[in-house]
Amino acid sequence: MVAQIRIGQGMDVHAFEEGKFVTLAGVQIPHTHGLKAHSDGDVVLHALCDALLGALALGDIGQHFPDTDPEFKGADSRVLLKHVYQLILDRGYHLNNADITVACERPKLAKYNLEMRQSIADVLNVDLNQISIKATTTEKLGFTGRQEGILATATVLISH
């Protein structure tokens, strides 16, 4: 039997607001600001959720967890990711790998890379080498360059 392979891509953006940390990939990272959001504002996990949902044409994170629903106010995005991944598993698919890029000037993320990757691997119950996270800047261009927020993109490969 030939394996069925699907690719999904997701993106998320959140603006900065008052706060003392940002949550990225389920990891609290000290910062001069937080992220404005209905849930915990974890752009990494939101982009990953959208990539997984997109791979099987299951809609997007806003359809599954609307920001108008008080149930998801302040929600831990690791719980959302676990729910989304269960939808993938229920359809007989599994994650081959995820490649994630985070764009921001600050906070600097290099020292949190392994912890963020491990956090995702733990939620999805996959090997660490299946999760890649890269951080970049936009060379001071655009809203991330002006330090107004953070952007994350995620690409996944899943197979049946």
From Swiss-Prot:
UniProt entry keywords in alphabetical sequence: Isoprene biosynthesis, Lyase, Metal-binding
GO biological process assignments: isopentenyl diphosphate biosynthetic process, methylerythritol 4-phosphate pathway; terpenoid biosynthetic process
Assembly and binders: Homotrimer.
Listed pathway(s): Isoprenoid biosynthesis; isopentenyl diphosphate biosynthesis via DXP pathway; isopentenyl diphosphate from 1-deoxy-D-xylulose 5-phosphate: step 4/6
UniProt-recorded name of the protein: 2-C-methyl-D-erythritol 2,4-cyclodiphosphate synthase
Annotated catalysed reactions: 4-CDP-2-C-methyl-D-erythritol 2-phosphate = 2-C-methyl-D-erythritol 2,4-cyclic diphosphate + CMP
Transmembrane segments: none
InterPro entries: MECDP_synthase, MECDP_synthase_CS, MECDP_synthase_sf
Keyword Lyase listed: yes
Family membership: Belongs to the IspF family.
Gene designation per UniProt: ispF
Gene3D superfamilies: 2-C-methyl-D-erythritol 2,4-cyclodiphosphate synthase (3.30.1330.50)
GO molecular function, one term: metal ion binding
NCBIfam families per the UniProt record, alphabetical: ispF (TIGR00151)
PROSITE patterns: ISPF (PS01350)
Positions that bind 4-CDP-2-C-methyl-D-erythritol 2-phosphate: 12-14, 38-39, 60-62, 65-69, 136-139, 143, 146
Lineage of source species: Bacteria, Pseudomonadati, Pseudomonadota, Gammaproteobacteria, Moraxellales
Record's function text: Involved in the biosynthesis of isopentenyl diphosphate (IPP) and dimethylallyl diphosphate (DMAPP), two major building blocks of isoprenoid compounds. Catalyzes the conversion of 4-diphosphocytidyl-2-C-methyl-D-erythritol 2-phosphate (CDP-ME2P) to 2-C-methyl-D-erythritol 2,4-cyclodiphosphate (ME-CPP) with a corresponding release of cytidine 5-monophosphate (CMP).
E.C. code: 4.6.1.12
Cofactors that this protein relies on: a divalent metal cation
